[in-house]
């Protein structure tokens, strides 16, 4: 009989301390493989394996592509790569971001649901936004066990709260109680996999993350997931499909970028900010050119032309000032409010 031998853990803001607290209580003879995704910057090395390794009775390391999965080990997603499970091997993929992240919690969880099914235990810890919610739904659909950190304890409760709003989780616990539960559950028999077939959407989305499809097949598969919306992808600017996933509002483009409603909103705000700064740059270049034309017009005694371009400079200055004020938070509809950054994770990278 199969046991619960696949434990997948996702964390974001506040996640370093949460992971340390959880990992230090896992037994040295844990009969399961543990996979961890922590949102970290893409452009810096991660010291998470070393930090966790100092507290863990289990060996901890960044995962290597195509290495065989072994029980009693902790695999950490390296920066800028999705950590995935494929049968009995680890896959590292530099694929499209999900929920603006690479590595993505959803991508790991979905791959575990696809290949490990009821043997999977999913754990969502502290974090901002809602990465992990769709992945936990996939684990639930496949008969796996779902655990979240108690939102009242989590320093950033958005991620565990989001999961609890979407599915009926099996356990909501304090950090001190999660590891003992994992030690126990990993020694219990999992349900029969045949009782929980892989849903078509989980199969398709896991295949997309694992880069198993050619372009034509990818577009056809995206059509199966939902209908084309009137929205565009913040990453590649292609069309977005609205995914049919019960009451969970999600989107995908045909390249493979995936978004929850919350992450799409954040992506749109980032895209808008880039566009507005581009507008400021264009207006300032327009002013520079107009001022050069004014200088030449005055030297040629072309006063009418000079006055016309002076008005253009005034208009461009007014527009540029208004946009700058909006970007810097000095106007209503402030878009310059910073998103919650994983400052703690950045400090260890």
Where are these regions (language model features)?
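Short helix-adjacent coil turns
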Residues: 256, 297-304
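Conserved acid/base catalytic micro-environments in cytosolic active-site loops
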Residues: 1-295, 311-332, 346-348
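Short, charged, amphipathic alpha-helical segments
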Residues: 303-314, 338
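Composition-driven low-complexity segments enriched in polar/acidic and proline residues
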Residues: 333-345
């Amino acid at each position: 009989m199969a046991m619960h031998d696949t434990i997948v853990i996702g964390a974001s803001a506040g996640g370093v301390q949460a992971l340390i607290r959880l990992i230090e209580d896992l037994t040295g003879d844990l009969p399961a493989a543990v996979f961890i995704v922590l949102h970290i910057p893409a452009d810096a090395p991660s010291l998470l394996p070393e930090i966790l390794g100092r507290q863990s009775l289990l060996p901890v390391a960044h995962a290597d592509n195509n290495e065989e999965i072994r029980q009693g080990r902790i695999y950490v997603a390296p920066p800028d790569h999705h950590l995935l499970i494929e049968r009995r091997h680890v896959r590292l993929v530099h694929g499209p971001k999900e929920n603006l992240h690479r590595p993505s919690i959803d991508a790991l969880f979905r791959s575990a649901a696809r290949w490990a099914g009821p043997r999977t235990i999913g754990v969502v810890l502290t974090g901002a936004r809602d990465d992990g919610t769709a992945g936990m739904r996939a684990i639930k659909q496949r008969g796996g066990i779902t655990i979240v950190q108690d939102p009242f304890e989590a320093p950033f409760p958005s991620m565990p709260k989001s999961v609890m709003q979407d599915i009926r989780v099996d356990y909501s616990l304090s950090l001190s109680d999660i590891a003992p539960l994992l030690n126990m559950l990993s020694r219990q028999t999992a349900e029969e996999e045949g009782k929980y077939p892989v849903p078509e959407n989980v199969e398709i989305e896991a295949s997309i993350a694992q880069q198993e499809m050619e372009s034509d097949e990818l577009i056809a598969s995206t059509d199966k997931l939902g209908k084309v919306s009137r929205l565009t992808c913040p990453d590649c600017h292609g069309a977005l499909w609205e995914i049919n996933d019960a009451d969970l509002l999600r989107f995908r483009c045909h390249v493979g970028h995936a978004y929850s409603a919350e992450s799409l909103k954040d992506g749109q705000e980032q895209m808008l900010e880039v566009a507005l700064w581009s507008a400021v740059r264009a207006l300032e270049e327009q002013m520079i050119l107009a001022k050069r034309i004014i200088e030449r017009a005055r030297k040629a005694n072309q006063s009418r032309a000079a006055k016309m371009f002076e008005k253009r400079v005034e208009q461009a200055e007014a527009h540029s000032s208004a946009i700058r004020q909006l970007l810097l938070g000095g106007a209503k509809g402030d878009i310059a409010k910073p998103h919650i950054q994983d400052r703690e994770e950045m400090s260890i990278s």
